């Protein structure tokens, strides 16, 4: 029997993808032996896939104001924000509302 896996989908929209190598969708397979919360996921993203200007995405241990986070099309504020525990096949969407002009 293999190591348990947690498969999720990350999506980036409205400019957020520019901070992640211009990739709008990523399918991730995470270590299923670990409890994965949004807080843990953000740390993993910072260490592994955030390629440009982290200060535009993260502020301390959370996303910056102006970055909307939807988990399975539901605002993360309704689901516990950083404490939300990721489930198999979750879709986590990051939308930037920060636009130059």
Swiss-Prot record:
Going by the entry's taxonomy, the superkingdom of the source organism is recorded as: Eukaryota
Biological process (GO) annotations?
A: negative regulation of JNK cascade; protein urmylation; tRNA thio-modification; tRNA wobble uridine modification
For this chain, the site of the Glycyl lysine isopeptide (Gly-Lys) (interchain with K-? in acceptor proteins) cross-link is: 101
Q: Which InterPro entries match?
A: Beta-grasp_dom_sf, Mopterin_synth/thiamin_S_b, Urm1
One GO cellular component term of this record is:
cytosol
Q: What happens to this protein after translation, modification-wise? A: C-terminal thiocarboxylation occurs in 2 steps, it is first acyl-adenylated (-COAMP) via the hesA/moeB/thiF part of the MOCS3 homolog, then thiocarboxylated (-COSH) via the rhodanese domain of the MOCS3 homolog.
Q: Where in the cell is it found?
A: Cytoplasm
Please indicate if the UniProt record lists rRNA-binding as a keyword.
no
Q: In which pathway does it act?
A: tRNA modification; 5-methoxycarbonylmethyl-2-thiouridine-tRNA biosynthesis
What main location does UniProt list? cytoplasm
Give residue numbers for the modification (1-thioglycine). 101
Keywords, alphabetical: Cytoplasm, Isopeptide bond, tRNA processing, Ubl conjugation pathway
Gene3D superfamilies associated with the record: 3.10.20.30
Keyword tRNA processing part of the UniProt annotation? yes
**Record text on subunit structure and interactions:** Interacts with cer.
Q: Which family does it belong to?
A: Belongs to the URM1 family.
Protein purpose: Acts as a sulfur carrier required for 2-thiolation of mcm(5)S(2)U at tRNA wobble positions of cytosolic tRNA(Lys), tRNA(Glu) and tRNA(Gln). Serves as sulfur donor in tRNA 2-thiolation reaction by being thiocarboxylated (-COSH) at its C-terminus by MOCS3. The sulfur is then transferred to tRNA to form 2-thiolation of mcm(5)S(2)U. Also acts as a ubiquitin-like protein (UBL) that is covalently conjugated via an isopeptide bond to lysine residues of target proteins such as Prx2/Jafrac1, Ciao1, Eip71CD and GILT1.
HAMAP family attached to this UniProt entry: Urm1
Protein's recorded name = Ubiquitin-related modifier 1 homolog
Q: Which organism is it from?
A: Drosophila sechellia
Gene giving rise to this polypeptide: Urm1
